[in-house]
Curated annotation (Swiss-Prot):
PANTHER family: GAMMA-BUTYROBETAINE HYDROXYLASE-RELATED, TAUD_TFDA-LIKE DOMAIN-CONTAINING PROTEIN. It comes from Enterobacter agglomerans (Erwinia herbicola). The lineage of its organism: Bacteria, Pseudomonadati, Pseudomonadota, Gammaproteobacteria, Enterobacterales. The gene is ddaC. Pfam families: TauD. One of its GO terms (biological process) is antibiotic biosynthetic process. This is Dapdiamide synthesis protein DdaC. Its cofactor is Fe(2+). Involved in dapdiamide antibiotics biosynthesis. Catalyzes the alpha-ketoglutarate-dependent epoxidation of the covalently bound N-beta-fumaramoyl-DAP-S-DdaD to generate N-beta-epoxysuccinamoyl-DAP in thioester linkage to DdaD. Keywords: Antibiotic biosynthesis, Oxidoreductase. Its EC number is 1.-.-.-.
């Protein structure tokens, strides 16, 4: 039996997030995509919020992920702590409830990135906890052209120190206990790595600041420099780390691809563009959001009460040396 679906902009004037509802309670999300090819509709809409589709458990969400995915992805080369709750399903970033997570494209610092990201609101927060969505092409248009041009020319270099102290250990980040596996991964993914001790790994990777969408070919702001940059930390923490470690041993940092420091005011300008472009909407328990990870970015607002939002990554997008030269060393 075929069901009817209603697709409309979630908010007037913000076409990059559409709300999908169904006429009957037995309609399913996977049936919707049997009539609307996922790649085509996401490249047009950006993100789809499915509401009222009786997704109540992680296992149901996992089954949906496996149906929709051409290829599932695991969280390797991790940036944050997560727990696996079902096949292909993870907790959202485990970060203090009172803090904001700035909008970003998932794993944009990696060479191979998720083409799509799926969220499931297992339990919406009592207050706050929204997942804002921003159109990455609008973010790009809001950043001064001189700044964009410099990033196009120089790229971004992400620097990390894994020593099990302030940030993740290398074992957690790369999901292995074997140094050889880390080294193999780094070679395969254009990452320079250096062992400073048995427990201390330093990495450096050169990436582009923008990326063209594989289908519509639009250029998108696509990076995580504002999350890696030292100014993402609160001032007292930043000052303490710089005093004790210096720039070279910071847990994470981002500089121009040339090695030059990115001025704080440039990073602040980029953060302001991300905030200006975001669309904020409240979760309802059972909501499923399916987004094109290159077209749109996401974040998290502070919250009160219990909040459980799951996430899955699917359909890897591989770099093109011609279109994205900084994806190669």
């Amino acid at each position: 039996m075929s069901h009817s679906y209603n697709v409309r902009p979630l908010v007037s004037g913000a076409p990059h997030v559409s709300l999908v509802t169904a006429s009957t309670s037995d309609a399913s999300i996977d049936e919707f995509f049997s009539h609307h090819p996922i790649d085509e509709i996401l490249s047009e809409k950006g993100a789809l919020l499915f509401r009222g589709f009786s997704i109540n458990e992680d296992q149901q969400f996992s089954q949906l992920v496996s149906i929709l995915a051409k290829e599932e992805l695991t969280y390797q080369e991790r940036s944050t702590q997560r727990k696996k709750t079902a096949q292909g399903v993870y907790t959202s970033t485990e970060y203090p409830a009172a803090k904001t997570i700035a909008n970003h494209s998932e794993n944009a610092f990696q060479q191979v990135v998720p083409g799509k990201i799926l969220f499931y609101a297992h339990q919406a927060a009592l207050k706050g906890g929204e997942t804002p969505i921003a159109d990455n092409s609008r973010v790009l248009s809001l950043i001064d052209e001189e700044i964009v041009a410099e990033f196009r020319q120089k790229g971004i270099r992400y620097l990390r120190n894994f020593d099990g102290g302030f940030d993740l250990s290398w074992q957690e980040a790369f999901q292995t206990e074997k140094k050889r596996e880390v080294e193999t991964y780094c070679v395969k993914n254009a990452i320079d790595c250096e062992w400073l001790s048995d427990s201390h790994l330093r990495t450096s990777q050169l990436r582009s600041a923008t990326r063209r969408h594989p289908l519509n070919r639009k250029e998108m702001w696509f990076n995580q420099l504002h999350l890696f940059h030292i100014t993402n930390l609160e001032l007292p923490v930043r000052q303490a780390l710089l005093a004790s470690l210096g720039h070279d041993l910071l847990p994470r940092h981002a500089v121009y691809g040339t090695g030059e420091e990115i001025p704080d005011e440039v990073v602040d300008h980029i953060r302001a563009a991300l905030v200006k472009a975001e669309l904020v909407f409240p979760w309802q328990t059972g909501d499923v959001l399916i987004a094109d990870n290159i077209l749109v970015s996401h974040g998290r607002k502070p919250f009160e009460g219990e909040r459980a939002v799951r996430v899955a990554l699917i359909d890897p997008v591989y770099p093109s040396a011609e279109e994205n030269p900084h994806a190669q060393r």
